[in-house]
From Swiss-Prot:
This is Actin-related protein 3. Keywords: Actin-binding, ATP-binding, Cytoplasm, Cytoskeleton, Nucleotide-binding. CDD domains: ASKHA_NBD_Arp3-like (cd10221). Functions as ATP-binding component of the Arp2/3 complex which is involved in regulation of actin polymerization and together with an activating nucleation-promoting factor (NPF) mediates the formation of branched actin networks. Seems to contact the pointed end of the daughter actin filament. Required during embryogenesis for the developmental migration of tail hemocytes anteriorly, along the ventral midline. It is found in: Cytoplasm, Cytoskeleton. It comes from the Eukaryota. It comes from Drosophila melanogaster (Fruit fly). The keyword Acyltransferase does not apply. SUPFAM superfamilies: Actin-like ATPase domain. The keyword ATP-binding applies.
Length: 418
């Protein structure tokens, strides 16, 4: 272990990618998962095209620079958590490693993350890129949910650390509810929810548009996003919240000021009901999506009920939040209250059906919030990749050359701290 450079930890998400080195508390770089490429008409003979293709392959920008590059088209290699375009992904990783981390890939082991239910073929593609293109000495592909569970140890004592729990991971593009038992994902019980950060932003945008508050149209999306991140919170009861705003508007309405990028004139927006209505779509999804009406608390409860009976109590006891869209004030408290309500109602019904003969043992529902929540997946990866065990479970370049990319289909669970 001595003299070895720290592992690189890269978590590529739908909206943002988190890059950094193992052992650090926070990622060194958080960049949008966007890439700007030149799209030219494919004309001319093959030789000319081959020459220009080599040049084109180097002519691209990623992250914030991608949005500033004029004359380029912006692409997103990841959609809803899954890699959609592997050529773009390879180019994206190339700049992540060389331009941002400024690392020599031959000298560092790598930990990459994958979404739940990622296909084994995708792991093979990842292995091919890392071993063939970057020539890395070792690679480990970790499931995001397991890393998020490990990150929650930051707020717990050593004897409470467990890799059994249910992860509510809500980012920009997708929300997953993932049950994990002893570090292994219970794949058949995972649920995906079509509501995440991007949907909240669009919903706030539409609420502001209805009021016609004088936001420049080309800035309406970024204004909605800024309002979401700065002013939104989760309320315990919508009706009471509306009443609060109506009786004391001065106390609750906030002011957001921005500058028109074209005319440079300042504009102001009064932010009222949007503050609590935006994130409320987690608990009342029908507000923004009439096709989907099941609240998040009910989905978490259903997922746990679908799991094997012997892990249900530990799952209720360790509901871990992860991702930027769980950062709203009082999100954890509201989720815990709603789940506790449905659990207690169920226990009461079973007691009534048995006419009092069966007294069910109360179920302890605990939603864990902690200070590393926003970058939980990256932080969990950073923690695990800084342990000596990490280097024992990594797939090495030698094994890859002997057996091929199929070795990366399985990545052993480690770090259960037993």
């Amino acid at each position: 272990m001595a003299g070895r450079l720290p592992a690189c930890v890269i978590d590529v998400g739908t909206g943002y990618s988190k890059l950094g080195f193992a052992g650090n508390k926070e990622p060194q770089f958080i960049i949008p998962s966007a890439i700007a490429i030149k799209e030219s008409a494919r004309v001319g003979d093959t030789n000319t095209r081959r020459i220009t293709k080599g040049i084109e392959d180097l002519d691209f920008f990623i992250g914030d620079e991608a949005f500033d590059a004029t004359g380029y088209s912006i692409k997103y290699p990841v959609r809803h958590g899954l890699v959609e375009d592997w050529d773009l992904m390879e180019r994206f990783l190339e700049q992540c490693v060389f331009k941002y981390l400024r690392a020599e890939p031959e000298d560092h082991y790598f930990l990459l993350t994958e979404p739940p239910l990622n296909t084994p073929e995708n792991r093979e593609y990842t292995a091919e890129i890392m071993f063939e293109t970057f020539n890395v000495p070792g690679l480990y592909i970790a499931v995001q949910a397991v890393l998020a569970l490990a990150a929650s140890w930051a707020s717990r004592s050593a004897e409470e650390r467990t890799l059994t729990g249910i992860v509510v991971d809500s980012g920009d593009g997708v929300t997953h509810v993932i049950p994990v038992a002893e570090g292994y994902v219970i794949g058949s019980c995972i649920k995906h929810i079509p509501i995440a950060g991007r949907n909240i932003t669009s919903f706030i945008q539409s609420l502001l548009r209805e009021r016609e508050v004088g936001i420049p149209p080309e800035q309406s999306l970024e204004t909605a996003k800024a309002i979401k991140e700065k002013h939104c919170y989760i309320c315990p009861d919508i009706a009471k919240e509306f009443a609060k705003y109506d009786t004391e508007p001065g106390k609750w309405i906030r002011n957001f000021s921005g500058v028109n990028t074209v005319t440079k004139a300042p504009f102001n927006v009064d932010v009222g009901y949007e503050r609590f209505l935006g994130p409320e779509i987690f608990f009342h999804p029908e507000f923004s999506n009439p096709d989907f009406t099941i609240p998040l608390s009910e989905i978490v409860d259903n997922v746990i009920q679908n799991c094997p009976i012997d892990v249900r109590r530990p799952l209720y006891n360790n509901i871990v939040l992860s991702g930027g869209s769980t950062m709203f004030k009082d999100f954890g408290r509201r989720l815990q209250r709603d789940i506790k309500r449905s659990v207690d109602t169920r226990l009461r019904i079973s007691e009534n059906l048995s006419e009092g003969r069966i007294k069910p043992k109360p179920i302890d529902v605990q939603v864990i919030t902690h200070h590393m929540q926003r970058y939980a997946v990256w932080f969990g990866g950073s923690m695990l990749a800084s342990t000596p065990e990490f280097y024992q479970v990594c797939h090495t370049k030698a094994a890859y050359e002997e057996y091929g990319p199929s070795i990366c289909r399985h990545n052993p669970v480690f770090g259960t701290m037993t």
